Amino acid sequence: DVKKLKVNVAAKKLKEINPLTKIKTYKSKLDSKNIKKIIKNYEIIVDGSDNFETKFLINDYCLKLKKKLITGAISKFDGHVFTFNFKDKKTASLKNFYQEKQISNDNFNCEFDGVIGTTASIVGTTQANEALKMIVGIGKNLKNQILIIDLLNLNFRKVKFKKKWYKTK
């Protein structure tokens, strides 16, 4: 699967697991010109992007469109998972945890830092579990919390953070 588009590989693998699955793929880079068209018809957005510019863009549009957002970030042995329901005005935002000016793709770069496969797997599985809980309406999501995963030392912890107002682009 090297040098193949991730979206094509993912769609193929999902169809192998369940051929009845309806999959809509987008083969363009997500940007401010196409994001609204892409996410407007979905209730829950699961973000697996690998850079903070895209994560902040998704966060801003989910906030504007009042979507539910589950986002994950990974680097080496570390992972972060957030769940936001922007229909609820008390929900914090990704920018309440990560300060946009303090985060650069140079500091958190999967291509440079590398990613351990199990880190991606655990963060992705946790995001899928959060989505299932939202769909079914059971359990507690990570509202105004971050799940911090440290696989090197096998630590999992939740940290609360507060909502602060910020201006979207």
Label each residue range with its predicted role:
Residues 1-169:
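Adenine nucleotide-associated cytosolic modules
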